[in-house]
Every structure is written in C-alpha cells, then in structure tokens.
C-alpha cells in the first residue's frame, strides 16, 4: 500500500477538526494484531483490513475473521473513497497467491474468511477464476472454515450491453460454482452519488449483479453495504434499502464513511449512533435477514454471525 501526498481535487477542502467521540474503534490485543500482520508479510499477502485501514481489524482478528485482498494491491478503478492504490496492475495474477492465502488461513486457524479483490478490468475473466481457485485452496487445508466473497461488478469487455451482461453472468457463475457461504457486492452509496463516489461502476448494474446471483444459485445469500456521510439524505438511504430488497438481497451493512486522506472525497456528515439504529430498524422491517448498522460497521464486520 502506498499513501499519496499529491494534490487532488479534494486537497483544498478543509478536513474535519476531529472525529466525533462515538468513533472509537476496538483495537484488539497488540499481540493478535502483530501476529496477523507478521504472517501477512511472511506470505506476501494483501488484506483489505490493512490496505483499507479498517477500524475493526483488531476485533476481527481476535474473533478469528480476516478479509484477504486478491489479485494484487493495485486496482484498475479509481473510487473516490478507497484507500487501495490505483493504476494498471501487472497483467498476470500471481498463481501461488491462492496457496499462500490457504496457508495463512490454516496457520491463523481462521473460522471465517472473506475474500475480496481489487478490480481487474485488465483480465478477461476480471479475476473470477482466481476467486474460485482460492476458495478451493482454502477448503483443501481448512475444510471447516466458512468463506464469503466480496466481489467487484465483473463488468466490461464488450460494448454491446446484452453481450456484456452475458459475459458478466458467466464470470459470476465461476465464483458461485465454488459455493461461498455468502455473495457480497457493495452499492456503497445512494443512486444520486454513484458517479462521484464509484467511478467505473453504476447503481443499477450492481443491483442487477445481486439479482443475478440469486437467480443463478438461490441457496447462496446475497449481501451489500452502504457508507453514510457522503451527502446522502435519509429518504435516499431508505430508497436504497428498498432497491436492495427488490432484488432479494438478504443482508446489509451500514457504516460511517471515514476519509482515508486529503486525497479522498471529504466527509459531509457524521451520522449519530441513533441514526444507524434507526436505519437498522427500517432495514429489518423491510425484510433483511441480517443487518449490521453502526458508525464503525464495514462489509466484513461480524460477517461470521449467522443470519436470522
């Protein structure tokens, strides 16, 4: 991971003075943090916990959960909120990365693993085969470990929309055939803010991906996540939750966006803990089977807990 100091369109915006008092991450034990971080270095792996500076990584490590970042550490997309390095990655994915991830899972005795990836628009399959390969590698050495996937939209490679949709579904099928316990794809924000926040992705394309997952394998629950604090309104948040339910999305996470650096899109609002409780009740009322909502909630937070 690299932290850039170069000026961006956001650099001139004055940062917030201080995080609100309710933004207090659980650090976990220093020994547990060090153990995971050392193993990640030893096996030359990337984790979104570290790359994305997740505020919950100490708590997750302590509970036997970790999120591995596949396909390298450079993303072909340039989302305005994300800490992961942007650019054009090396053409080939490291074929031994799957084995190294499996070794790390075994050594750490992880109970629940989330596999995510940088966007790899440069590859024909957008990294779908690598997801499948890694799931199978983990199952060989840690058969009782549950594996969730958090994927990009697998979109691209064809101008014709009908053909592009067919290709996207074929990539999705590769991942779902490996039978993850949950398929996660994040909307991130409300429809109005998509273009600014998620460059290269679209709101309805993501909804269609979640819908397609349920159509391909309805035994695998689907999940999506939202960040608050980017300028969205309450009614837009509720509409987004309704849109997710309209494609039979069963799980949702709702958390506060925290600006990684001055190079990233600024926080417009820090929502109160009671607001997150409010949206949780609404989501549950809409029929979501599992809702995690709170200022520090992220996509993988308490992912190991079963849905109701």
From Swiss-Prot:
It catalyses: [[Fe-S] cluster scaffold protein carrying a second [4Fe-4S](2+) cluster] + N(6)-octanoyl-L-lysyl-[protein] + 2 oxidized [2Fe-2S]-[ferredoxin] + 2 S-adenosyl-L-methionine + 4 H(+) = [[Fe-S] cluster scaffold protein] + N(6)-[(R)-dihydrolipoyl]-L-lysyl-[protein] + 4 Fe(3+) + 2 hydrogen sulfide + 2 5'-deoxyadenosine + 2 L-methionine + 2 reduced [2Fe-2S]-[ferredoxin]. Belongs to the radical SAM superfamily. Lipoyl synthase family. SUPFAM superfamilies: Radical SAM enzymes. Binds 2 [4Fe-4S] clusters per subunit. One cluster is coordinated with 3 cysteines and an exchangeable S-adenosyl-L-methionine. PROSITE patterns: RADICAL_SAM (PS51918). Residues 61-289 form the Radical SAM core domain. The keyword Protein biosynthesis does not apply. It holds the Pfam family Radical_SAM. GO terms for cellular component: cytoplasm. [4Fe-4S] cluster 2 binds at residues 75, 79, 82. This is Lipoyl synthase 2. Its EC number is 2.8.1.8. Pathway: Protein modification; protein lipoylation via endogenous pathway; protein N(6)-(lipoyl)lysine from octanoyl-[acyl-carrier-protein]: step 2/2. It is an enzyme of class 2 (transferase). Keywords: 4Fe-4S, Cytoplasm, Iron, Iron-sulfur, Metal-binding, S-adenosyl-L-methionine, Transferase. Its cofactor is [4Fe-4S] cluster. Coiled coil: none annotated.
């Amino acid at each position: 991971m690299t932290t850039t100091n170069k000026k961006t369109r956001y650099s001139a915006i004055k940062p917030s003075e201080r995080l609100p008092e309710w933004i207090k991450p659980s650090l976990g034990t220093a020994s547990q943090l060090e153990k995971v971080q050392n193993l990640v270095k030893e096996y030359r792996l990337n984790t979104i916990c570290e790359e994305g500076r997740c505020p919950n990584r100490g708590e997750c490590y302590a509970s036997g959960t970790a999120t591995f970042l596949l396909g390298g550490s450079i993303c072909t997309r340039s989302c305005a909120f994300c800490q992961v390095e942007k650019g054009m990655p090396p053409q080939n994915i490291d074929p031994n990365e799957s084995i190294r991830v499996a070794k790390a899972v075994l050594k750490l005795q992880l109970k629940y693993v989330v596999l995510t990836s940088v966007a790899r628009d440069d590859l024909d399959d957008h990294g779908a085969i690598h997801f499948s390969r890694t799931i199978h590698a983990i199952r060989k050495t840690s058969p009782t470990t549950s594996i969730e996937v958090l994927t990009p939209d697998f979109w691209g490679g064809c101008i014709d929309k009908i053909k592009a949709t067919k290709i996207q579904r074929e990539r999705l099928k590769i991942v779902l055939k490996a039978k993850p316990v949950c398929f996660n794809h994040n909307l991130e924000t409300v429809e109005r803010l998509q273009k600014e926040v998620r460059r290269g992705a679209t709101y309805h394309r993501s909804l269609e991906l979640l819908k397609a997952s349920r159509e391909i394998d309805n035994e695998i629950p689907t999940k999506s996540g939202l960040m608050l604090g980017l300028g969205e309104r309450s009614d837009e948040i509720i509409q987004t939750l309704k849109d997710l339910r309209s494609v039979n999305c069963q799980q949702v996470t709702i958390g506060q966006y925290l600006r990684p650096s001055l190079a990233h899109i600024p926080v417009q609002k820090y929502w109160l803990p009671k607001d997150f409780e409010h949206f949780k009740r609404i989501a549950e009322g809409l029929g979501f089977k599992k809702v995690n909502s709170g200022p520090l909630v992220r996509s993988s937070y308490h992912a190991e807990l079963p849905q109701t």
